[in-house]
């Protein structure tokens, strides 16, 4: 498939719209609770925008294997719920006050409510998996949530630590982001009755796409504008998170530059250092380095699903991979 033949994001969304409407309806239905605060906070976060890329992968993956049932909708919903719950917990841990262009749930409702409703959404996800009556998917999801939690703890340990290695950083990306993308593709393949090779292909697609997606997010933290990004530019540095662009700039800078970045990571919270850090990144092409790594991962995602039968849904998955590294939000 040539780059000029790629589908636009609007075309992909139009193709997936019948399924995604059902996913969105299911998300809202599953947030129902006799406890009013659960619904209020749940609706607040799920209606706050977001790319819905994980459920999109699930419905496109199932369709790419010719599946027309409803279990792919359940897969898409439970994957989005795990992601949503992790965001609620993330924002509390990071003390974030802005996401997707508006106040975070913890800023609006408080930390305790965010953590507890996050727990509710996590457990609701497991109820949804139980509906699929697939021990394999349950096992995959249980492992993924455990890996995600490990990634959260590892990232917490990395905060304010300039000695974080690139390998360590990439493990965190896999645990926190790529693993759940994997689940979206793999679970969809299982409910669609795909072969082992097709299941592996869609699992690999998810892993590579998830890695590319997070790498781009880390680049955008330094190169986007606040309105497009939907959060404060430079949040990672302010939070003392050593992401790939920072690690690259520190490794390639001179002693004075490396010391400045080390201090910025160790101290965190110093937004006034951003301009200096950006200048160092620009000099050493650190953002380009991270973006090129993202493009390599996106290409691996495309190559992974070469074995899938030709269809507009396969084209959509291919296009989605390329589009994920060609965005400013």
Curated annotation (Swiss-Prot):
Lineage, highest ranks first: Bacteria, Pseudomonadati, Pseudomonadota, Gammaproteobacteria, Pasteurellales
Catalytic activity, reaction form: 5 isopentenyl diphosphate + (2E,6E)-farnesyl diphosphate = all-trans-octaprenyl diphosphate + 5 diphosphate
Cofactors: Mg(2+)
Name by which UniProt lists this protein: Octaprenyl diphosphate synthase
Residues that coordinate or bind Mg(2+) 1: 90, 94
The gene coding this protein: ispB
EC assignment: 2.5.1.90
UniProt-annotated binding residues for Mg(2+) 2: 90, 94
Binding-site residues for an all-trans-polyprenyl diphosphate, renumbered to this chain: 99, 176-177, 214
Annotated PROSITE patterns: POLYPRENYL_SYNTHASE_1, POLYPRENYL_SYNTHASE_2
Protein purpose: Supplies octaprenyl diphosphate, the precursor for the side chain of the isoprenoid quinones ubiquinone and menaquinone.
Enzymatic class: transferase
Statement: the UniProt record of this protein carries the keyword Transferase: yes
Residues annotated to bind isopentenyl diphosphate: 51, 54, 83, 100
Protein family according to the UniProt entry: Belongs to the FPP/GGPP synthase family.
